[in-house]
């Protein structure tokens, strides 16, 4: 006996939904992992039965960090392998590295171009949707990543499935043929969401463009809830440092550049504020890389506490303690300011980080953004975001997540 309703449900269940996510996860980097975790947790609530594919450049480490966040998540690097291969200028043959996105779009959506990755291509071709998670990884800093976006657009174009991009930071904007490839691809997306005004202006006229801020807002409430408990009598002079060593070549202060300049600036700031070493906490946003400046500071940090990335990831970012932050990294600024902490945002690379940090002050962060590293900023006491500003940012991102992935039980 055939029961039409049951038969329809059985047929629907037999065609399992595949949600295909693309993200720079697994390096690891606090912000990138926070964003991936936030979306996986949302999907665990909204689409618990779906197969979720996270295509990222370091799937092994990403799997170790994120495999518990959704019951059916799998990790691969299909598109990231293709993007890296096509952009490689050391090859004597193969795709044209000056237009790598052309080959990647073809290889990702048709069999034969990348036979070793056929299993991954098969999964990508069967995806029910494709989604570039937020971050600042498709821009002039990493131009070859435009291939990821073009591949997603090609899937949408050839199969009709929706393509989404959320919380994108496109500044510094790609130029020339790379810029054209990006805007042409963006036009194929059902939703193309950006995190800052400059990125929105760069896509002026592209249908489907919206602006709801950084994707980390989707996970801020969890990040604040996971923060280590505050001591009953925290230090009133505490300072937390999160200082990168990558992308610092353009930083200039006191007649020096790069890491030397950043080290001198931080030392001078700590001295001006009269912060003793034992009042300082050092945070790793990227493991290893964020210990370079603290190591250079040497005895100036005598007695300081260091929180390695592993502890940050498993035990939470130590925010809400009343410390004043000095951070070059963007997502520690976002989370600490969301907790109400005061801070100074230092811009290590102006064409990239200025837009990022100022996207937060534009929506209410009261942090000081350093414009002139030769001038030591006064220690701020104004706090970060107000509760209403934080809640507004969280609500906007949650609303977008609900629109893209409404709750479904089958």
Q: Where would I find each of the regions flagged by the language model?
A:
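Active-site anion-handling motifs in enzyme catalytic cores
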Residues: 1-410
């Amino acid at each position: 006996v055939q029961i039409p309703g049951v038969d329809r449900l059985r047929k629907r269940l037999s065609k399992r939904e595949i949600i295909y996510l693309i993200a720079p996860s697994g390096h690891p980097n606090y912000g990138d992992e926070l964003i991936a975790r936030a979306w996986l947790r949302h999907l665990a609530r909204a689409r618990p039965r779906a197969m979720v594919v996270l295509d990222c450049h370091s799937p092994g480490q990403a799997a170790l960090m994120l495999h518990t966040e959704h019951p059916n998540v799998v990790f691969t690097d299909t598109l990231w392998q293709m993007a890296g291969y096509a952009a490689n200028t050391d090859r004597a043959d193969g795709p044209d590295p000056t237009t790598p996105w052309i080959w990647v779009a073809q290889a990702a959506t048709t069999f034969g171009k990348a036979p070793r990755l056929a299993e991954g291509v098969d999964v990508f071709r069967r995806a029910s949707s494709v989604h570039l998670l937020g971050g600042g990884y498709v821009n002039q800093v990493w131009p070859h990543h435009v291939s990821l976006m073009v591949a997603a657009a090609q899937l949408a174009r050839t199969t009709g499935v929706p393509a989404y991009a959320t919380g994108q930071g496109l500044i510094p904007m790609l130029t020339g043929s790379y810029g054209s490839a990006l805007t042409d691809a963006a036009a194929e997306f059902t939703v193309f969401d950006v995190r800052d005004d400059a990125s929105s202006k760069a896509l002026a006229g592209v249908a489907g463009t919206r602006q709801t801020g950084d994707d980390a807002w989707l996970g801020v409430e969890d990040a604040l809830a996971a923060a280590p408990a505050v001591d009953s009598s925290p230090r009133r002079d505490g300072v937390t440092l999160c200082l990168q060593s990558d992308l610092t070549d353009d930083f200039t202060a006191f007649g020096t550049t790069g890491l030397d300049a950043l080290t001198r600036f931080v030392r001078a700031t700590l001295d001006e504020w009269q912060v003793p070493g034992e009042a300082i906490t050092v945070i790793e946003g990227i493991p290893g890389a964020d210990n370079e400046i603290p190591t250079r500071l040497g005895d100036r940090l005598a007695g300081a506490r260091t929180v390695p990335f592993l502890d940050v990831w498993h035990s939470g970012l130590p925010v809400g303690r009343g410390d004043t932050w000095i951070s070059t990294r963007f997502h520690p600024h976002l989370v600490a300011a969301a907790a109400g902490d005061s801070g100074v945002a230092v811009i290590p690379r102006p064409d990239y980080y200025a837009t990022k940090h100022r996207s937060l002050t534009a929506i209410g962060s009261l942090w000081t953004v350093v414009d002139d590293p030769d001038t030591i900023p006064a220690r701020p006491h104004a706090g970060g975001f107000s509760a209403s500003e934080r809640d507004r940012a969280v609500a906007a991102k949650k609303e977008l997540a609900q629109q893209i992935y409404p709750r479904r039980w089958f």
